[in-house]
Amino acid sequence: MTGPGAPLISVVLPVGNVADFLPACLDSVFGEPGQPGGDLEVIAVDDASSDGCGHILDTRAGRDPRLRVIHLTESAGPGPARMRGLAEAAGTYVWFVDPDDLLAGGALAAVTGRLASCRPDVLLIDYLIRRRSGRTEPSPGAALLAVPPAAAATLTLAERPALINRTMTAWSKVFRREFLTGLRVCFPPGIHEDVQVSCAALLSAERIALLDRVCYVYRRRRHSFLATTSMAHFSIFPAYESVFALMDAGGNPAGPGGPAAPGGPRLPRVSAAVRAAVFGRAIEHYSTILANGLVPRRGRREFFHRMAADYRRYRPAGYQRPPGLRGMKFAVIERGAYGAYRVLGPLNNARAAMARAWPARRAQPAR
């Protein structure tokens, strides 16, 4: 339970061998002028780093009492490190920040202001993508965060199903801590560990708030987990399969390959529009992994057919494919036509590249 005097936000950093990036991340969190000290605690979980991250954290903690460092003796990966940090957090809200990324200037002030004004279960924030060249670009679907002047302060996924198309990352959301722990879902080991938590939170939340300001800078790194070509990307399938099981069970979450968790929350009835949006998001996520060359060549055909099987298994009744090239891609996936998919892939990639080159609006950092 959150007690008197507890901070408003607990920032949780799962730290694993990112010494080249960690100081800048810490500066972005602690260096914001005018941030009330009592509103913030930072819990850094050193995931048995071997590159000096532990020393960087301990040195910083000696200068700033808002930072608490937990050292793990064996590396468990970012998912379990987040869970350890969550267990130690005292804040009303928790924000999982990756230590190779940055908070944008003014982010904490903007976030705390929105949290205080509408007390949501989940706050969705905007972000910038910083590529290795240093070039930045706005987040895909940033327009989804726009709030009409007369709109209510919070909403549900049923009211705006397209919100499921925002990134599945944990760092793009600020969670009410007791709401999150009440979901009885966890960040598992491995990659794509954010998917089940993100989906369960959005499906369950009665109060979702939107912050149409850039609060986070996501660094695209060559050697990050999600940018590495690996058979580990097959873990995306059990991640989404657990989400479909969650919707079918009415909100009693099951971990990938595991039984339903007793005592979990009951989801509101999942509308046809929400189910269709989650389905489309899953298929698009699968196909993006394949299109970006993240699956080794030897596993691509198998990955495609696993995607096609999920398409046929989870396609909602009456589902209408999207228009244009994306709809053609979905049709080819449904048929399991790998050869046609390989031909269509470059066209879809060109469409996506054009969308990135001509964004609907230019995102601005929070200030």
Labelled PLM ranges:
Residues 3-6, 292-367:
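Membrane-interface aromatic/basic loop that binds lipid-linked glycans or pyrophosphate carriers
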Residues 28, 46-56, 74, 103:
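A conserved acidic beta->alpha catalytic loop
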Residues 72-89, 96-102:
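Glycine-rich, basic loop-to-helix element that forms the pyrophosphate-binding segment
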